[in-house]
Amino acid sequence: MATITECRGALDRLSDGLARADGDVRGAAALDRSLSCHVTDLDTTFTGRLADGRIRVDSTVQGPPPAKAQIRLAMTGDDLVAMVDGRLNFAKAWASGRVRLEAGFRDLLRLRSLL
């Protein structure tokens, strides 16, 4: 089982990858939205923002997200690490229910290029 530190590191690597991206991925990452990532097996939530092509983690809290972020992710720690490392396809994991993504319809359309 991935640790909180490993999950935070995965989010940092994802942020770095978004910052280096170009084209459609860069455009999708250019949103300015509140973000939460609930790591279900650790019952820990990272909250922050997707802004300027990066993910900024502002806090780590026990339990589910304390507020409803505009973009909400939920998955196990192992799935988060595997997805960021390229060992888990996000679209397949999302379709099978292993990963949950909730956002407004327009945001989902823009985020699809990240999938």
What residues fall within each predicted segment?
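Feature captures hydrophobic
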Residues: 1-115
